[in-house]
Amino acid sequence: MAPPPSLAPDRGGGEPDDALRLRARAAAAAGDAPAPQQQQEQRHQEQQQQLLWYRASAPAHRRVRESPLSSDAIFRQSHAGLLNLCIVVLVAVNSRLIIENLMKYGLLIRAGFWFSGTSLADWPLLMCCLTLPTFPLAALMVEKLAQRKLISKHVVILLHIVITTSVLVYPVVVILKCDSAVLSGFVLMFLASIIWLKLVSFAHTNYDIRMLSKSIEKGVTHDISIDPENIKWPTFKRLSYFMLAPTLCYQPSYPRTTYIRKGWVVRQLIKCLVFTGLMGFIIEQYINPIVKNSKHPLKGNFLNAIERVLKLSVPTLYVWLCMFYCFFHLWLNILAELLCFGDREFYKDWWNAKTVEEYWRMWNMPVHKWVIRHIYFPCIRNGFSKGVAILISFLVSAAFHELCVAVPCHIFKFWAFIGIMFQIPLVFLTKYLQDKFNNTMVGNMIFWFFFSILGQPMCVLLYYHDVMNRQQAQTNR
């Protein structure tokens, strides 16, 4: 067996082995094959040469080389083996923690926190949820009146403002009037927020379609290529499809697939159920015991608060990743498959985000497209600077995060609002660090630390203790 080329000494004035082999192959290709005697002589020479390769006097070090983990060579190496090691260690450590938790606490699955004893009797929330589709129908009626020019442009805008405002105020009033479970209120506010975003897009897009139609009638198109499929008037069928489709941006037509993969849908539904159960297990077995044994992070000892936040960071990260996979990958793709919705870019590789700004652009594509289309670029077109447009976008996002969390919890401490607005300085900080150090890893690590290790566990502790304090105060009355 031939040694590595680095251990083979120079042959002096002789011809290298590689050259001999190349000459032999070239001669064979040309039809001038060596005679058997020549082949035997060649093999004998190779055997004699191999004896020299393993002599003690043969040099073992022949060139300058870096260690694989040195700073100059580490990024040129493949670390697949280390990644496999990390996965094995992660599985082993988490398996031990699960077994230890079950041996210490037993199975803690309960539904009291999510579904109270009155959850099935929360008929006001159920009735509110069932009546939410009336708001899209009202928006369609407004567009029909505008299409027939029975109402003016300003009246159309006013009616859409009334409809979109009502679709948020109505569920908020119902939830605050009823002492419902947290999960029931969250689901209702989540649906109401989605309908609000869709109706704003519906109204804004149709307003722009009317403006484009008037420009076409006048022969003024501003040199913009207009697809006739995207300037059609709204119909009940188009609105119904839009309200069910996994998108927040209205348009008269969407890219469609040709058929439904029924077996694929069943597999995704099974995965969705499995990961939903996993989320519930982590919450009940890990997150609830940790927060129960903690104090309010703003009232207790600082070191104890840091210890609780760090202990809570891993399970909350797992729950958040499961939630992302269940909703953005499984559920939205299931909806897209059932509706033959073609554009399924619901997220990008946000885990590789180099800055906080990149993360917000990549992790939730339906909301990102909505913000770009209906907030950011309209602000730019109206003369606002880029920084002001970003600030307004974050304000809207922070307001909806606060609504979806604070209203179901019946607590208005603005923790979610502050958490989202705190992302603005992080946007500029990570952008500055990336430009200063020309290193993509710095911003990525800052994003993971503030978002997953510090931000989410802190919000969980703050809201949990506020909810528990509110429930305790109600019990003492």
Curated annotation (Swiss-Prot):
Belongs to the membrane-bound acyltransferase family. Sterol o-acyltransferase subfamily. The lineage of its organism: Eukaryota, Viridiplantae, Streptophyta, Embryophyta, Tracheophyta. GO terms for cellular component: chloroplast envelope; endoplasmic reticulum membrane. Keywords: Acyltransferase, Endoplasmic reticulum, Glycerol metabolism, Lipid biosynthesis, Lipid metabolism, Membrane, Transferase, Transmembrane, Transmembrane helix. Residues 1-48 are annotated as: Disordered. Pathway: Glycerolipid metabolism; triacylglycerol biosynthesis. This is Diacylglycerol O-acyltransferase 1-2. Pfam families: MBOAT. It comes from the Eukaryota. A motif (FYXDWWN motif) lies at residues 346-352. One of its GO terms (biological process) is triglyceride biosynthetic process. The chain crosses the membrane at residues 79-99, 123-143, 155-175, 182-202, 230-250, 263-283, 319-339, 387-407, 409-429, 442-462. Residues 12-21 have a biased composition (Basic and acidic residues). The gene is DGAT1-2. It is an enzyme of class 2 (transferase).
